Amino acid sequence: MPGGVEGENSRMTSPLRPEDPTRVGDYDLVARIGKGGQGVVYLGKAPDGTRVAVKVMETSWASNSRARSRFAKEIEAASKVAPFCTAALLDSDINADPPYIVSEYIEGPSLRDAVLRDGPRTGAALDRLAISTATALVAIHQAGVIHRDFKPANVLLGPDGPRVIDFGIARHSEATVTATDSIVGTPAYMAPEQVEGRELTPAVDIFAWAGVMVFAATGQSPFHDETLPAIINRVLHQPPRLDGVDERLRPLLEACLAKDRSAAPPRCRSSVSSSATTR
């Protein structure tokens, strides 16, 4: 399969590299979709010809017990979430060499790619995106899962609506935070308590949701800057940049991105949940 976009509304793929596997389990791997911290996501084919997304742990991580444990937690988290809001988990083998996860293949670009290609969302399109992604997060939280890395690249714009993907650093909402896993995520969309390594609640996903909606409306995160230290400083100490955000959404997003985390999350969770139920 040649590199590039398969179609105007498809996900970007690239050819397999010489070091890539061509088959794992019962699945043929035909192209690369993307690469994460510990694994590569491939476009695959099931025995019946159905296209699937196959995440394969890189061999350099496969012998790391902590990495395998995180991979297993990703499988557990994805299996708990209602399939309407994510790419449904189809198969997995944590004991394979290397371990892999097979998910439903969503035909459509990520929100990040779509905004960079077509420009920001406005009007009804932005409203639909806000409500549908809020609905997905409510369902994820109802399953007892905190995503912890909600960002534009992890929202796929499928033909039947947005899907939230990549539960690689998600965990159960009652799990204990440890020093080794507390500070993970994408800085421009991380809540202050996540940056500081404090105890996490579903509120961190609501903060990220607001940041993603700002990106969808403007093409940039509300804490965009040139360097990682500058981004973190903005998250912790500077107000979000909301220029260009629709006035109807702005008060809610501003509240969700507030530095006073003790007051903002309950109000935002209530507002986001209310928005979701109006879908």
Where are these regions (language model features)?
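Eukaryotic protein kinase
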Residues: 2-279
